[in-house]
Amino acid sequence: MFDELLFFSDNRPVKRFWFIALVGIFCAQSLFTLADDSLKSLLPVFGKPLKAAKLPKAALPKAQVELGRVLYHEKRLSRDNSIACNSCHDTVGYGVDGKKFSLGFEGHLTGRNSPTSFNAFMHLAQFWDGRAPTVEEQAKGPILAGGEMAMPSAEAVVEKLGKIDGYEALFKKAFPKSKPAINYDNVGKAIGAYERLFVTPGRFDKLLAGKNKALKENEIRGLKKFITTGCVACHTGNLLGGNSYQKLGVINPWPNQKDQGRFDLTKKEADKMFFKVPSLRNIAKTGPYFHDGSETKLEAA
């Protein structure tokens, strides 16, 4: 039930992680095997299998990834030098911090649960409300958010980085055509380049690739149930989510009505309580669940 994967992280080029395959968590009724044609016919809804990311060989993107790695772990990107991207999206914690709400500047609690940064660049958009189109744009948001890293302005970020030994050289190497090399857009571009290595393939992908013994029998039963009960209507594609917005509280009103989801961004009545559907990759390790962290147990979620 556990798969080994390779993942680029921290101060080492490669770090090993173990994660629980999504499909192993679900219960089911009757026995199905991969010889079952009905199951095989349903698998195309998940698309092509994920493939592990590789460090770029070309000098320029490699330099951008290296700069992004440093910036991702740089606490001095926060106003009080205490919070980095990695604080809430921990690369040794499956891209999350495991908290209902993350701690921001001066102990402020963020209003939403921190989603995993793993595989995030493949989502249709970033943040629970989709307000950033790419991980490069997303990376620039929390740094300036008052309740998160709380830097007063993009200019203040650039000035601060310019005074730290080593950054001038790293930025010039990563962005040789930029004048000046240290600018706020390049901060986002570098962090995004690093995050684009956060790909976590596993046994489920072996199944999608046609390897009949990739999953155990109970996992196959769970997958069959997952598909036939309609979970796949929202959690679809090879990320099992991350590619649509859906409404919470369709049958009964969602208990937390303070956060109106995409409505707070678009001001469109039709967007009330719509949130991005999270990916179920590594889901057993990325709780608590939902945008408000309201459920701690996966079975209940």
Please give the residue ranges for each predicted region:
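Post-cleavage N-terminal segment of exported redox proteins
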Residues: 2-8, 13-65, 123, 141, ...
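Short glycine/threonine-rich turn/loop motifs
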Residues: 36-141, 203-301
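Central I-helix of cytochrome P450 enzymes
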Residues: 147
